Regions:
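Short linear recognition/processing motifs and adjacent strand/loop elements at protein termini
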Residues: 1-231, 272, 309
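Active-site histidine-acidic residue metal-binding/catalytic motifs
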Residues: 214-295, 299-301
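Histidine- and/or cysteine-centered catalytic micro-motif in compact active-site loops
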Residues: 282, 308-309
Length: 309
């Protein structure tokens, strides 16, 4: 679209449109894996891959999932997710039992489309783009030549009832949605199927709990005005946690120096076009390599560029 739309919302009625039995009752003692930060790494719990896949999504701080096992630096949950131990804590309790989900509102707010929900317990979920033609390659199973998704699925764990969706008249990113009941590895779950208003036009999502304890999904509204963009540039390698420089590959020059030079050039050209650019100062500050995309999220970036050579 050409410009950010005004803030408008459609509100839910609270009418219950689906029910499921609780997977774990309130009289059952359990151990939870509880996330201790937003934008934590989430991995596929059915394999040992060290790369977090795009078909899992991001979960907010406070999310609860049932503990299944652990190995090395990971906790594995019964829903098939795997978390770094540094991103989560183990806590004892009883099963969630009845855990209703109420859809409060859908609309646009502050340059994002949003969906606001109320949950009794902060159960986990999975956000998955549907309609992409992935293929396997050197970097794994999720290589793409083009982003062609038509729908976004949000599959909720341990939810026992859901309410009717408001209309999508005031939602720019999605044109429609519906609740489905699906069987995931023998467990019945609710899935929210969201139809993209423009196929292939999707910039990901964030999920956090707001000040009133509501689950808030945000989906950035993309515009044709490059001046609305924030781009974070990450020159590869640089200062390590021990204070010395990581040069990267070494040939006639050091890779880190080449990366920094290219990053500064890209930064200057983008700024000349009116883009808000943030360059990570990897030449003077330490940024954990695995978490650099998450540092970028703190700037509300629309595009993250990691430069290597």
């Amino acid at each position: 679209i050409d410009k950010i739309p005004t803030d408008q919302s459609s509100f839910g009625t609270g009418e219950i449109v689906g029910r499921l039995s609780a997977a774990v009752s309130e009289d059952t003692s359990v151990t939870y894996v509880k996330l201790n930060k937003n934008f934590a790494y989430i991995y596929d719990g059915t394999n040992t891959d060290s790369v977090n896949p795009p078909n899992v999504g991001q979960l907010p701080e406070g999310t609860l999932d049932y503990y299944k096992s652990e190995w090395d630096e990971y906790y594995v949950t019964t829903s098939g997710k795997r978390f770094l131990k540094e991103d989560a804590d183990l806590t004892s309790g009883v099963g969630m039992g009845e855990n209703p989900l109420v859809v409060n509102a859908i609309g646009n707010m502050g340059g994002d489309s949003f969906i606001q929900m109320a949950l009794e317990d902060r159960s986990s979920f999975t956000v998955t783009p549907i309609g992409n033609d992935y293929y396997s390659g050197y970097d794994g199973e999720f290589n793409l030549d083009d982003f062609t998704a038509t729908h976004i699925n949000i599959t909720f764990d341990n939810i026992t009832s859901v309410t009717a969706l408001p209309d999508f008249d005031n939602c720019t990113v999605f044109s429609a949605g519906e609740w489905q009941q699906v069987d995931v590895d023998g467990v019945m779950k609710f899935r929210l199927v969201l139809k993209l208003r423009q196929p292939g036009v999707y910039a990901g999502n964030s999920a956090t709990y707001d000040s009133e304890g509501n689950l808030l999904f945000k989906f950035e509204i993309l515009t044709n005005d490059i001046g609305n963009m924030t781009i974070v540039i990450d020159p590869g390698h640089g200062v390590t946690e021990y204070g010395y420089d990581d040069p990267g590959a070494i040939g006639h020059i050091e890779e880190a120096g080449a990366n920094l030079a290219v990053a500064k050039l890209v930064e200057s050209k983008l700024k000349a076009l009116g883009v808000n650019v943030v360059r990570l100062k990897t030449e003077s500050e330490f940024y954990d390599t695995k978490r650099r995309p998450y540092y970028a999220r703190d700037y509300g970036c629309d595009l993250y560029i990691a430069i290597h050579s």
